[in-house]
Amino acid sequence: MASLLTLDRVTAGFVPDIDILQNVSLEVAEAGITGLIGLNGAGKSTIMRTICGFLKPKSGRIIYNGDEIAGIAPHSTIARGIWYIPQESSLYPRMSVSDNLWLPLEHLRRCGILSRDETHHRVDEATTRFPVLKTKWSANAGDLSGGQQKLVEFAKAFVIRPRLCLIDEPSIGLSPKVAGEIYDCIDAFVSGGMTVLLVDHNVRRVVRTSHHIYVLSLGQITASGSPADFAGDLHEQVKSWLGIEF
């Protein structure tokens, strides 16, 4: 598969003298799932925040669809087809579920990317695909359970239909049932041609789901390979580095 996103020796940090990411290089193949695993504090979320423009790298390049995007503002990355589903809810708690869903669509419409008819069509499709939208349409997002909020987050990605979706810890704190629904969504996204960069504390699930996996340790890529690679010698090395079974 061709590469949609490339990080080339990216170094980044939130303060001048501390680098959370150190010369990170990786590639995300188009229309597939690239998994990123590592211990807490390894820098996985920082990679995602750097890609989508919340953190400007100190050095290195970020190439998306052939264009350099390092340091571009988040609203510009959205218009380019990059969407971020963070670990914490990004919904506006005092806004209704419907308003949370419509807000990014209106941004894309104002950018000339979507027509008004297309935005309505996508919302209609989402209400069929995600039952929580029908039952909680007028409710404030802050009144929803954690699982319901996560499903609304994925409904937003469904209507936006980015080319690249960055998904950070989608199953943390969720019941097995809701976590299964979330991964069904991810599978459907990729089947529809979306590209996914996935981080999840459930390493077994990441290895089973992804087409290619990178291991991050202390801000550096320490291993990478296909799921088959992780069934052999690399499996034993990564178990030793992470101190976990998968």
Language-model-derived ranges and their functions:
Residues 37-39:
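The feature captures the beta-strand-to-loop junction immediately N-terminal to the Walker
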Residues 15, 95-121, 129-131, 225:
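ABC-type ATPase nucleotide-binding domains, specifically the catalytic core motifs of the NBD
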Residues 52:
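Helix-to-loop junction immediately C-terminal to a conserved catalytic motif
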Residues 157-158:
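ABC ATPase C-loop
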Residues 1-4, 11-23, 30, 73-74:
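A short, flexible loop at the N-terminus of ABC-type nucleotide-binding domains that lies
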Residues 60-69, 80, 118-123:
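Conserved ABC transporter NBD signature motif
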Residues 82, 88, 128, 215-218, ...:
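C-terminal boundary and immediately downstream tail of ABC-type ATPase nucleotide-binding domains
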Residues 140-144:
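Conserved ABC ATPase signature
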